[in-house]
């Protein structure tokens, strides 16, 4: 009789855990027990509860790091320390630079066991995640005056370098407006010389203004030399073409 009762109790227990609902409840219990995933807080050295991470990469419980920042800020009022520091690496930390970690799409509301009492401190709610529309958790430039000064100095250096580059670009004759005008003038003069050489009329040019380059020629020896070289080159080209034409007439 006792053996039959034991078998029925074992069968009932097995069927209870074998159902999907029983498995789901057991899995939820395991998840709630291991919500921290095995990571420990660097202050209380216990399984992390409401985890937050600093910009320097250290993991803390939100109540622990809030108390730490609170006591550091209170003690800094009576000393020269300006901002609370990380307990591990002594980097500057604040509530704005803490990044909350929300696992499995929610927040654990189960109170942590073994935590120190609040000591009269009202711990606010953990900051919202940036992904959920919270405020951006990067440190502002106003909190660090030295970085702000370095940034401004870099901007001033970049602004002083930019006109130098622009001056080097403008010094190029091809990019400056004056250089472009001079190049256009040279090409127009060479074109007029070629037009006059081919058609044998030095008084009529390809433009509506005859002798439009006489002033430039008379005022610039360099222009005179370039035009004379162009004239000789055109003469040689015309003579070569004439010889080719005569040769073609003789042979064909």
From Swiss-Prot:
Reactions performed catalytically: S-ubiquitinyl-[E2 ubiquitin-conjugating enzyme]-L-cysteine + [acceptor protein]-L-lysine = [E2 ubiquitin-conjugating enzyme]-L-cysteine + N(6)-ubiquitinyl-[acceptor protein]-L-lysine
GO molecular function, one term: ubiquitin-protein transferase activity
Compositional bias annotation for Polar residues: 140-162
Keywords, alphabetical: Endoplasmic reticulum, Membrane, Metal-binding, Transferase, Transmembrane, Transmembrane helix, Ubl conjugation pathway, Zinc, Zinc-finger
Transmembrane segments: 232-251
SMART domains: RING
Protein name: E3 ubiquitin-protein ligase RMA1H1
């Amino acid at each position: 009789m006792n053996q039959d009762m034991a078998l029925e109790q074992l069968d009932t227990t097995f069927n209870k855990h074998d159902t999907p609902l029983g498995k789901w409840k057991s899995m939820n219990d395991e998840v709630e027990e291991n919500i921290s995933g095995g990571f420990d807080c660097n202050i209380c050295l216990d399984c992390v509860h409401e985890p937050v991470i600093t910009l320097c990469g250290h993991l803390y419980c939100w109540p622990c790091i809030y108390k730490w920042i609170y006591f550091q800020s209170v003690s800094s009022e009576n000393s020269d320390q300006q901002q609370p520091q990380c307990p591990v690496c002594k980097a500057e930390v604040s509530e704005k630079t803490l990044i909350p970690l929300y696992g499995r799409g929610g927040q654990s509301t189960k109170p942590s066991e073994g935590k120190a009492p609040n000591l009269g401190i009202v711990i606010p709610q953990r900051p919202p995640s940036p992904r959920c529309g919270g405020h951006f958790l990067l440190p502002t430039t106003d909190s660090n005056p030295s970085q702000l000064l370095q940034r401004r100095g870099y901007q001033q250096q970049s602004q002083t370098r930019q006109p130098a580059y622009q001056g080097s670009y403008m010094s190029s004759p091809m990019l400056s407006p004056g250089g472009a005008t001079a190049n256009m003038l040279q090409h127009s003069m060479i074109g007029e010389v070629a037009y006059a050489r081919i058609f044998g009329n030095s008084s009529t040019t390809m433009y509506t203004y005859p002798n439009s380059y006489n002033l430039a020629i008379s005022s610039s020896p360099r222009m005179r030399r370039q035009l004379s070289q162009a004239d000789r080159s055109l003469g040689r080209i015309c003579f070569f073409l004439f010889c080719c034409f005569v040769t073609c007439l003789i042979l064909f």
